[in-house]
């Protein structure tokens, strides 16, 4: 599920006047929220608005937990609205900021928040997180307004740290639910090859599920020899592939401060050249090159030309990686593993999926009510468990692993057939130490788009001067990023 990000140059052209207007509204724009000495007033009614992208099934879950939240805070009315997809949320909010009509809370990706921060529309959460103010709830219980250290530690670190990816060491978001990339593979085929290898000792059947890129190359080579008409691997996102390689190789990609676009370097040019060779050998294709999600190749029958045996795609799209079930069951079982690594002892996988940001308001009680609701959704084990089971996204707190229903009725039933969603989430939870997020700034979405186009261009170019072509492609990508960022 790939985000379609509009060109930042057009977006900024549309928004330039918007931000000038926003800076002149009655509400003074400050990102650092100051908690009033009186704290949160539980006796005065307050209404907050939440923009998201949830379908009906997830809205039903949200509604149930708003009821639970209101048992604690009956004075807070939560109005929530589905606003299309992620980019639709961003586009509507950037328009509303101009007249001070933005919501209180919104689904967000880091590049969205970087845009909102141009108008200082979102607040930093640091003072709220650190607050030791005590709030008395309607049932007589109390809670600390801020996050306890145990609550902070419960977040999957890579997900939590996304909130500080803006270059100023301030926290602007909390994670709600996440996805990542995983390696889907035809487990039935791999098991059959393993059986043949055990029976014959023929090395051509020694085909292993790869854990490193070097192993992946060898696996692709052997699969191509066994099935010359196949494309062993499909990789959905060229952008994710490039960015993940930068992270795994500790090679510069972008920076939130100073010179932003750092990806034109020898290390990065070399891995693009290597993967171009894979493409030229017929080992791999991508979504843009193949003309659609590579799951369509992965779910093909092995007898069909152009089928694949591996696919790297979103963990949240697991059901799309499963072949159609027939009268005799599924044509093959799907296995799921962590994407290949440069160093298996220092794994890096991309973190994606929605976080929550809070917008500044002249009424501090709206901000406090918004914070209490965000805190409730992100730290409530029951909500995180149910939301994950319904959505197929990964919960953001580790304690969900100990939730009895989640563990016994979801994770423990994980398989590569009917329960493939649970298997995908399970793999996502097992790699909790590996998540990374890229720096967010004005132009970060342009960088993402351009490196994806760069990969596509370098893979498909017909030239004898490969190094020269790749060098030019990198230079043009950086130039386009700088142009779009202004």
Predicted feature locations:
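Extracytoplasmic "Venus flytrap"/periplasmic binding protein-like
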Residues: 68-154, 192-193, 302, 309-310, ...
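Mature extracytoplasmic/periplasmic domains
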Residues: 61, 68, 316-325, 342, ...
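Short, low-complexity disordered leader/linker segments with a strong preference
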Residues: 1-48, 71, 475-486
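Extracytoplasmic/periplasmic substrate-binding proteins
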Residues: 53, 63-66, 115, 239-251, ...
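Conserved C-terminal helix/tail region of periplasmic/extracytoplasmic solute-binding proteins
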Residues: 367, 414-416, 424-486
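Hinge/lid segment of periplasmic solute-binding proteins
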Residues: 35-36, 90, 111-182, 245-246, ...
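Short, well-ordered beta-strand elements
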Residues: 44-55, 76-81, 105
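Helix-loop-helix "hinge/cap" segment bordering the ligand-binding cleft or interdomain interface
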Residues: 71, 128-133, 137, 147-155, ...
């Amino acid at each position: 599920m790939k985000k379609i990000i509009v060109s930042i140059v057009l977006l900024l052209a549309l928004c330039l006047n918007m931000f000038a207007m926003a800076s002149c509204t009655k509400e003074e724009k400050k990102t650092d929220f100051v908690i009033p000495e009186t704290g949160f007033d539980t006796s005065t009614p307050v209404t907050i608005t939440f923009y998201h992208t949830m379908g009906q099934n997830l809205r039903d879950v949200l509604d149930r937990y708003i009821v639970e939240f209101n048992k604690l805070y009956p004075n807070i009315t939560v109005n929530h609205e589905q606003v299309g997809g992620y980019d639709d949320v961003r586009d509507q909010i950037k328009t509303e900021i101009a007249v001070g009509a933005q919501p209180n809370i919104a689904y967000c990706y880091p590049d969205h928040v970087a845009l909102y921060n141009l108008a200082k529309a979102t607040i930093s959460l640091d003072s709220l997180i650190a607050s030791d103010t005590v709030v008395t709830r309607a049932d007589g219980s109390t809670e600390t307004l801020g996050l306890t250290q145990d609550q902070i530690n419960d977040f999957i670190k890579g997900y939590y740290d996304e909130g500080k990816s803006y270059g100023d060491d301030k926290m602007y978001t909390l994670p709600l639910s996440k996805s990542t990339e995983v390696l889907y593979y035809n487990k039935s085929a791999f098991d059959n090859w393993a059986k043949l290898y055990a029976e014959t000792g023929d090395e051509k059947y020694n085909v292993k599920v790869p854990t490193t890129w070097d192993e992946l190359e060898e696996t692709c080579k052997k699969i191509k020899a066994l099935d010359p008409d196949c494309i062993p691997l499909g990789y959905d996102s060229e952008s994710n592939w490039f960015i993940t390689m930068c992270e795994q190789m500790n090679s510069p990609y972008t920076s939130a401060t100073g010179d932003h676009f750092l990806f034109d370097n020898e290390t990065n040019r070399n891995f693009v050249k290597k993967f171009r060779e894979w493409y030229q050998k017929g080992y791999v294709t991508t979504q843009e090159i193949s003309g659609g999600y590579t799951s369509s190749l992965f779910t093909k029958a092995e007898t069909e030309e152009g089928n694949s045996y591996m696919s790297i795609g979103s963990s949240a799209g697991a059901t799309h990686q499963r072949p159609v079930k027939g009268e005799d069951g599924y044509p093959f079982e799907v296995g799921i593993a962590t994407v290949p690594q440069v160093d298996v002892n220092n794994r890096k996988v991309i973190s994606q999926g929605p976080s929550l940001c809070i917008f500044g308001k002249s009424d501090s009680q709206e901000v406090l009510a918004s914070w209490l609701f965000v805190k409730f959704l992100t730290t409530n084990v029951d909500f995180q468990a149910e939301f994950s089971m319904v959505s197929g996204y990964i919960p953001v707190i580790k304690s969900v692993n100990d939730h009895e229903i989640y563990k016994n009725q979801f994770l423990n039933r994980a398989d590569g057939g009917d329960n493939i969603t649970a298997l995908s989430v399970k793999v996502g939870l097992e790699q909790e130490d590996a998540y990374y997020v890229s720096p967010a700034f004005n132009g970060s979405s342009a960088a993402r788009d351009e490196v994806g186009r760069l990969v596509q261009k370098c893979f498909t170019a017909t030239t004898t001067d490969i190094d020269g072509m790749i060098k030019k492609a990198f230079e043009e990508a950086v130039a386009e990023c700088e142009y779009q960022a202004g």
